[in-house]
């Protein structure tokens, strides 16, 4: 007696497996990345329901046509005023799901292949400026003896030394820092749960040692740069403290007053200063946590 072929999984079952099994368990993506994928799907499913007149539970893979995807992307830009970067990020989430679905439902390969043909939208990346060494040192400044001043000094030194993203810096715990003179470094936890170790300069080592002497209650699991409640600093607080430091630095470097200095500009400054010092681009890519030197270029 011939065995009956197993029916292909339903669209809702595929979506559930994509989030529960693929993203969370198999790829072990960070909660923030999974949340970005979830938001993209919520928007897409809401758009599909309005356009097709069917609830998400009634959708099938053949419903996910290039026309539907293109209409959704146009809706994001036109009606929701999403940037091209956000539009492409949401398309990437859909493409990731479709590639996953192709392994679970081979009967829909042709449909999926057509849908995967929707291209990302090209856009001009704005040229990002950077600070001179004099300007960067002025922003870092000299701590005035207060707790906040000393913490902010370490924060700004760490941002410049490591070229790290804000999320990586505020996530650093005391135990992530190695202060041995011969092999001083900080272990950063980056995007997609990737980890890397970045060497620490002597000035950074001295500042961290002074900070830890001032804060003996900090243990290996404590945030290196806490707020007054002992919790990790927020992104907003980092932006606020950087803005304050730039205002103070503008007294000695007046040109800073007219510039918007962001943590990402400091990251770019780190890359440019390393490049000017003769460091190879491939090393700078590892320093910044780029997957490819092409990104660093």
What is the predicted function of each stretch?
Residues 1-297:
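Conserved catalytic core of the tyrosine transesterase superfamily
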């Amino acid at each position: 007696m011939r065995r009956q072929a197993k029916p292909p999984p339903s669209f809702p079952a595929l979506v559930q497996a994509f989030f529960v099994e693929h993203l969370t368990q198999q790829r072990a993506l960070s909660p923030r990345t999974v949340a970005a994928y979830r938001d993209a799907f919520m928007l897409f499913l809401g758009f599909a329901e309005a356009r097709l007149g069917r609830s998400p539970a009634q959708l099938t893979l053949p419903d996910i046509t290039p026309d539907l995807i293109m209409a959704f992307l146009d809706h994001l830009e036109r009606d929701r005023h999403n940037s091209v970067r956000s539009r492409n990020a949401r398309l990437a989430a859909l493409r990731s799901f479709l590639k996953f679905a192709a392994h679970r439902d081979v009967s829909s390969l042709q449909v999926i292949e057509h849908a995967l043909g929707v291209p990302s939208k090209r856009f001009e990346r704005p040229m990002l400026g950077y600070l001179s060494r004099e300007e960067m040192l002025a922003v870092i400044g000299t701590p005035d003896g207060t707790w906040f001043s000393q913490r902010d000094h370490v924060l700004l030194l760490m941002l410049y030394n490591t070229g790290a993203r804000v999320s990586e810096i505020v996530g650093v715990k005391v135990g992530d820092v190695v202060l041995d003179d011969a092999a001083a470094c900080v272990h950063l936890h980056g995007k997609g749960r990737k980890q890397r170790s970045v060497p620490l300069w002597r000035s950074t080592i001295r500042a961290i040692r002074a900070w830890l002497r001032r804060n003996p209650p900090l243990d290996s699991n404590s945030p290196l740069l806490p707020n007054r409640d002992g919790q990790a600093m927020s992104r907003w607080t980092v932006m606020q403290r950087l803005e304050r430091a730039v205002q103070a630095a503008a007294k000695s470097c007046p040109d800073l007053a007219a510039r918007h200095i962001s943590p990402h500009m400091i990251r770019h400054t780190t890359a440019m200063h390393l490049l000017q010092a003769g460091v190879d681009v491939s090393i700078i890519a590892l320093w910044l946590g780029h997957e490819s030197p092409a990104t660093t270029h």
